[in-house]
Curated annotation (Swiss-Prot):
Gene Ontology molecular function: RNA binding; structural constituent of ribosome
Protein name: Small ribosomal subunit protein uS9
Biological source species: Bacillus subtilis (strain 168)
Disulfide links within the chain: none
GO cellular component: cytosolic small ribosomal subunit
Subunit structure: Part of the 30S ribosomal subunit.
Record lineage: Bacteria, Bacillati, Bacillota, Bacilli, Bacillales
Amino acid sequence: MAQVQYYGTGRRKSSVARVRLVPGEGRIVVNNREISEHIPSAALIEDIKQPLTLTETAGTYDVLVNVHGGGLSGQAGAIRHGIARALLEADPEYRTTLKRAGLLTRDARMKERKKYGLKGARRAPQFSKR
């Protein structure tokens, strides 16, 4: 018999995470490595686990993730978004809990582009009065 799986795609900055939830004991595997190997920061790992702790499903699913693009923070945000969407597919009753915590909303903040005539997005060259 085929195993039950729930899918969710999460995005943040320039990172994209494809998340699969499989019934298990709570392991999180990112790009075929344990989460602590891929993301060294404990704060980011807590951030990733937030949807599971809010819905009290922390020990019921194994989370298998493929993530690419961006840096560690962007990837963590993408994984969190993907887990929230996959949990929603698993049980639609989680919608209110996840929505209230803001986990279903795609964070649209992106890096602002550098403008010509400026040193950065907003940083102007030094001004000299004389």
